[in-house]
Amino acid sequence: MFGNLFDHVEYQTHEVVFDKNHKVNLNISKAATTELHLTGQVLWPASYLFCYFALKNKALFKDKNVMELGAGVGLVGLLVSQLGVKRMIMTDGEDDIVSLLEKNRILAQDTFVKDGNIKDAVLSVKQLWWGVEGEIEKCLGPKDNCDIVIGADILANALGDPRLPLQCAKDILMYNRTDRVKKQFVCAYRSRSELNREYIRDVAKDLGFTLQIVPPSSFLPAEIPSTHTIDEDMLLCIFELRP
């Protein structure tokens, strides 16, 4: 899948430090852009919000099978993979972004070994196009399932209707579902307007989700590095599918 797409692309290594026990090293393209097909090369602010939520709620992810939608450079998935998950699958669509994501997965595993802190989680990268038949089956085996879907800045963006990622998250959570345990889609995003928030609530309800909005004040630390951009209009949402 990944071929030689790295050969003519320049990257710079960026270290994101949350505390003494949790950091993520990332390769980021020097030509990072906001063009729609390459937005995954950018470190989006909601990723930082999600990471702080995850660090405050480690028990939510422990021993869980997790899949990330729109993983981009991989900050969220690579941080969550350090929190005791059973399996982490990071996904994105465009070839260039999937290649960069794979590059960062390899860098993360090399870092784990060098630090003498090898993680137990099975960490992988898959290509996933939302709403395309057969895509989920390419990411999950015939006996696999997913407990939690995660994402950052994938609901309210220039790509339009949030129904697409919400429907994709539901389809993943329902894939091979045989238990009676609640399933969750946890997402951080920038709320563009009250109208946008209401529409997302309506779509979630229509798809069978219950929605909980978690106040950032309940999990953000007192001091945040200036490089970790977190804006007041960002939300952390838990969309839950009950048995």
Give residue ranges: language-model regions.
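S-adenosylmethionine-dependent methyltransferases
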Residues: 1-243
